[in-house]
Amino acid sequence: MTRVLAVANQKGGVAKTTTVASLGAAMVELGKRVLLVDLDPQGCLTFSLGQDPDKLTVSVHEVLLGDVEPDMALVETSEGMTLLPANIDLAGAEAMLLMRAGREYALKRALAKVSGAAPAATSGTGAAPAATSGTGAAPAATSGTGAAPAATSGTEPFDVVIIDCPPSLGVLTLNGLTAADDVIVPLQCETLAHRGVGQFLRTITDVQQITNADLSLLGALPTLYDSRTTHSRDVLLDVADRYNLPVLAPPIPRTVRFAEASASGSSVLAGRKNKGAMAYRELAGALLEYWKSGKALATFAPDV
């Protein structure tokens, strides 16, 4: 069964995109078929994985509006992940979706049509149609599980879909949360970084009550963590206490490798064994085990 994970926080600069790319790459290393969905009009995930957002012929924009089938927009990354890319056109899609009934379900409907076939295009110039064995993509059942991309004849479904939500509480983020089985909230370990967390958690509660009753909040993921400072530890203690929110382990340490990876068009895992990459690998393995057996995710208790 395909698992759909949303990575979301209304605040920018908290390593959402890095988390999506790194978890995806780590799961590919573990033999999983992974689809990444870029829901940010800035196209940061798309750019960080070596695609040029300005040269895309089709993207998630057309997919959400129903103008093209999802398979038409998929591209393959150099690290074996499949990407549904985004560019600035997506900002226009957000405005158009606001005028449509059922706008929160646009992504869920689209993911139900994804065939799981390997996309043909690997360059940054747009996506060629993926093979669907001439049968089209049969929508999968979505009862109680978010949007599960279905397999067509001769293809296999994705094991995991990871959604990079934009830094806002608008209709695109609502689409990501409505389509997801689970959500992780990346949280930079600084005092100002957790301002607005309460509002975001209320949004998750609204989604659970209105559009996705099965959405599970897994917890906050500490990012840009510096174990040498008491400030980072104090922030995590405050978040856990104030919001009664699990703080996931391991924390993602601050490392210059994150910026270097984005500039090179690859994930932080590509050819590297730095502490950040190892932390994401550990979290990816824990998530897969949680989805397989229900084993609880480890939580982080800062030493004080």
Predicted regions and their residues:
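P-loop NTP-binding core
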Residues: 1-304
